[in-house]
């Protein structure tokens, strides 16, 4: 389609992603590195899922949410890394307009569910430590399913809103995206129509998908910390904190990189720094999550050993 052929409609039919580097010599090395990272991430998260499935001790609300988080991590990295690997092999990355918009939608859908699921996990820890007597009834299977359903619904609305808002923008000039996947800030930079509404939607979305969950997580853990500090036994304190330490580490990595990427409200321009943060957010975080959750958890470690060795759980 030629520019201006359809009036105010989108004239650009595809986008060219610059990727991580234009150095042809580095591209094979990057392919090997990120292919390895992808295999490790998918394998690690599938191992966590298998461990939760085979280990009766892990059939609890906390690990139900962790299993969903593992599925989300597989989805998030699968949305961005395989297309990037294809581009590294081809030495050029030309993405059709529809494919770019689809990638944008699914990335924000999965990342949004991730945000709210981490909040649900914090609420679960709050109930387990601060309200142990009513925990089993207040975190029943129905409640668990409802929380996951709410996470998905809110994230779907957010992702759909951003996708529709981007799809009505005019792209009638440059089509080179300075990133390795299609995301909001670099696409805003290419629009030849006003992005004021998109900027406001991004602010509102970042508030509901990032700030509000982070406040809820902070409040939950403030209550948890207060409850743990009232425990007189040092061993009891360590055990209580150990169940929350892994989750807090994941929260810090996920929200730290996410806020840096989307809360720079004064600028929507893309830069090489955004690519580095994008790697942390889309690749490193999903890859580290299985390691973080299994590193100091003997139940998960035991289940993983049985999965890897093929041994059944002792009856």
From Swiss-Prot:
PROSITE patterns: G_PROTEIN_RECEP_F1_1, G_PROTEIN_RECEP_F1_2. Keywords: Cell membrane, Disulfide bond, G-protein coupled receptor, Glycoprotein, Membrane, Olfaction, Receptor, Sensory transduction, Transducer, Transmembrane, Transmembrane helix. One of its GO terms (cellular component) is membrane. Glycans are attached at residue 8. It is a multi-pass membrane protein. Gene3D superfamilies: Rhodopsin 7-helix transmembrane proteins. One of its GO terms (biological process) is G protein-coupled receptor signaling pathway. The chain crosses the membrane at residues 29-49, 69-89, 98-118, 146-166, 201-221, 240-260, 275-295. InterPro entries: GPCR_Rhodpsn, GPCR_Rhodpsn_7TM, Olfact_rcpt. It is found in: Cell membrane. The keyword Glycoprotein applies. Residues 1-28, 90-97, 167-200, 261-274 are extracellular. It holds the Pfam family 7tm_4. Disulfide bonds join 100-192. The keyword Cell membrane applies. Residues 50-68, 119-145, 222-239, 296-315 are cytoplasmic. GO terms for molecular function: G protein-coupled receptor activity; olfactory receptor activity. Belongs to the G-protein coupled receptor 1 family. Odorant receptor. This is Olfactory receptor 3A10. It comes from Mus musculus (Mouse). The gene is Or3a10.
